Amino acid sequence: MVQVKNEGIILQATNLPFENEAVLNPTCIEANGITHMFYRAVRKGDFVSSIGYCQIDEGGKIINRLDHPLLIPEYDFEKEGMEDPRVVFLDGIYYFFYTGYDGKNALIAYATSKDLVHFEKHGIISAQFTYDEAEDLFRQSKALEKYQFFESVLKDRVGEDVFLWEKDAFIFPKKFNGKFALVHRVLPGIQVAYFNSFSELNDSYWRKYFMELDKYIILDPKYEIESRNIGGGAVPIETEDGWLLIYHAVEDSKYGKIYHASAALLNRDDPTQVIGRLRAPLFSPKEEWEKKGKVNNV
């Protein structure tokens, strides 16, 4: 059994207007001996999210924290929030992925930086078609039955014309046969998309991709702890035995949704080949501050 030490809370909301409601869902990367943390900062009132930033020392102590957001919503597709950041360093560039939320649609967007200070936004890279359109494409793959449930959930909750929801995106910190490998999450599983350039990720690319979706599934829910859905967590870590993927597993229980942390080991040359995955969670909500919050049982 894997033992995980709970280090407690390291970052909390402040009285600053951009993060006075909550701070959550961070991503970290080490550079020049410093751990850089980018996190979702939520403000009170309209609950719009921006991206906050701080630095952490080896002991887990905050040594520097901005008193203003590093990145803010600027475009219509992100007007209700920039959420769930992930940062990856590859070939001299920091790739920064996030979910752009416009009040209805949740779509993958990205930015780039060379210094983790100045970022250039490049816009949406995920598919922009409705669940009705996606269903027609899923019919041509073997993925329809597993993915159809969430079509009805989101259409009922958000609206008939909602786009295919995308979250939890990042690239592997290494190319495969010269191609980027983008991990993303169309409910309920985790998938990967390969491409030479981000400019390829257009409507034509995604329509062909979803017609063959079953070829690109890394993980689908399998065990009781992930009975509802799963989604990518930290950027994969390359080991001698394969890629270590930490992901969140959502259990449907009589108490509602429970978010667990889990892990899988993926083939170093083909991440759709799963070497092994945990049946029991790495860790689960135990402390009161994990069971009660802006989202419970996380």
Model-identified regions with their sequence ranges:
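Beta-rich carbohydrate-recognition and catalytic domains
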Residues: 1-21, 27-80, 89-228, 237-297
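Catalytic cores of histone-lysine modification enzymes
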Residues: 233
